[in-house]
Amino acid sequence: MPYLTSTGTARRTSGAEQLGFGVPGCAHPLLAPAEWAELARPGTPLHWAVLDIDDGPGIRPDPHCLEAAGRLRNARERAVRGEDPLDSVRASAGRLLGRLDLVHGSRPFGDLVADAQSYLDWYRVDGFYLDRCPAGRPDLPTVRRLTGTLSALLADSGSARHGGHLVLGHDTHPHPGYAEAADQLVTFRGAWTDYRWSQVAEWTASYPPGRFAHFVHGVPRTHLEEAMRIARWQGAGTIFFTDRTRETDPGNGRGQSDPFATLPRYWDEIVSRIGPAISE
C-alpha cells in the first residue's frame, strides 16, 4: 500500500469522537428512491452523499436527480435553521457532491471542469468527489491545479456553503502532500477481509479525523462494532460500511458490481449505533 508506515506513534481518535456517513455511490434515484429518501431523513448522521447521473452529470438535467438533490438540500437547510433539533444535516454536513472521474489522472482537465460546471448549474452541488484520484507524488501538481479550480468555481457559484467540500477518492494512503489539496481523503476502500487487518499511514496522525474516510464492503452485522473501532483507531471520521459484496450486488454500468450502490441491510442498526449528529 503506498505511503504506508508504522503506526507506532500515530495519534488515534477517541471513542467519543462521532462518526458520520459518506455515501460514495448510491444508485440513480429512479432505481433507488428509498435510499435517497433515507439520506434526507431527520436523524441520519450524514456527512455527504455523491451524485452520479451517467458517469458524470449527464448531457442534460435529470428530473429524478433534481428531485433527490432538492430533497437533500431542503433537509440540510431545515436543520441549519434549527427547525429539527435532531436532524443531523447541519451546516457542515448533509452535503451533495458531484462525482468527477479522474481515471487515475488520465482524464483531460477541460472535461473535468466542464462536468463540474454542469453539476453546479443543474444540481447546485455543495462540492465534488474526485473518484479514482491518483495517489503518487508526480500527479500532485495536476490534482492541486484541479482542486484549486474547483474551489474557485464553488466560491463563484454561491450554491455551496463555506466554499464547498472536496473529497479525493484515492482509496488508499496517498502521498502526504494530497492532504493539503482537498478537505477529505478516502484512504481505504475495499473488503472487510482486508480492512480488519489494515494499517494506517503514520502521517495521518497530524490531521483530525474529519480529514479521512473509509468505505468497506462485506462487513458482517456481527462485526459492525469492530469495524467502527478500527475506523476510530485509524483516525477516520467519515465511513460507509455495508454487508453487500461485489459478488452479490448489481453492476455499476461498467461491467463491475458495486456494493456501495445501495444501503446495507443493517442500515437502521448502524444509524442507531452512530446516533444522530450533534449540532455544531
Each model region followed by its residue ranges:
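Glycan-processing catalytic domains of CAZymes
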Residues: 2-280
